[in-house]
Amino acid sequence: MANINKTVKLGVFTLAIMNVTAVVSLRGLPAEAVYGLSSAFYYLFAAIVFLIPTSLVAAELAAMFQDKQGGVFRWVGEAYGKRLGFLAIWVQWIESTIWYPTVLTFGAVSIAFIGMDHPEDMLLANNKYYTLAIVLIIYWLATFISLKGLSWVGKVAKIGGMVGTIIPAALLIILGIVYLATGGHSNMDFHSNFFPDFSKFDNLVLAASIFLFYAGMEMGGIHVKDVDNPSKNYPKAVFIGALITVVIFVLGTFALGIIIPEKDINLTQSLLVGFDNYFKYIHASWLSPIIAIALAFGVLAGVLTWVAGPSKGIFAVGKAGYLPPFFQKTNKIGVQKNILYIQGCLLYTSPSPRDGLLSR
């Protein structure tokens, strides 16, 4: 039993999907849809100057240190010393811990929209106690799956990434194409400027948010020792993931902007509303609860990827002697159980995430 977790290997496709689920969150599409055609400029610009260079560096460092575990802790530590390596993995871990409530709130909204009564669904989605309960349930479910080891994490992340992110994104894009091809009215002006006006502060804010959208492609480096032939397969997985990410963001944003008027875009609920509008157009409203369930599953997969990733890097820090023995404890299959438990407690006990949820 002790060696089960160590013998599991990730294939190119599984790691690519894990990278996509770590980076892509469909909940962010409404925020960019309000900027129309110029949103594509931001996506492509950020991909060229941030996503692709980050992916190249991650692929190179993962291949260089394929026999050493730790991800950014190892990469930064080898170049600048273990103290800065610890700082790098700590920042990655703590920012993901604070980020969980944001993405999990979208999961709660998705579950609320499983019903067919949209006024009631919206009322439930805005209930802060319902949201808090769902956030904690999804997060701890992800934690317990992580405790089952990399085999479970890989399978759930791959299936969840396909069912909850890639397939819904592809469906959204196809629905947008069908809508336009059959004479549907586009709420997005495709004759507007592709290049944004940088004299407006709002456009600078959007540029910053797009860079944040692409954060996380390096996180897969944590699992480099768990990849078959990492020097060859890890770079493949990174670039496949990067390509899928850009396509989903650009075309998905367009599809959402086409079906929802700019004035009606809501950052939390518009993705579900967009699907609802498309389904009504093709007379298939019965698909709305199904897509809501799929999106909630996608949230679980995305959170699972981050729960299992940076915590493993913190575990590598502990094994290097920079944390007390308590942080080095594992379960019988070698999973960093104490770090996962502490991470879960921080989600609720930290004032920022908890107060943010209860103040909705």
Q: How would you name each of these model-derived features?
A:
Residues 114, 163-194, 253-260:
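Hydrophobic alpha-helical segments and their helix-loop junctions in multi-pass secondary transporters
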Residues 34, 52-139, 143-147, 296-316, ...:
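Hydrophobic transmembrane alpha-helices that form the core helical bundles
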Residues 131-183, 215, 238-243, 360:
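Membrane-interface loop-to-helix entry segments
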Residues 9-27, 46-47, 135-138, 195-259, ...:
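Hydrophobic, membrane-embedded alpha-helices of multi-pass small-molecule transporters
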Residues 30-41, 115-128, 150-162, 290, ...:
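Transmembrane helix-loop boundary segments of multi-pass membrane transporters
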Residues 2-4, 77, 104-133, 167, ...:
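Helix-loop-helix connectors at the membrane interface of multi-pass transporters/channels
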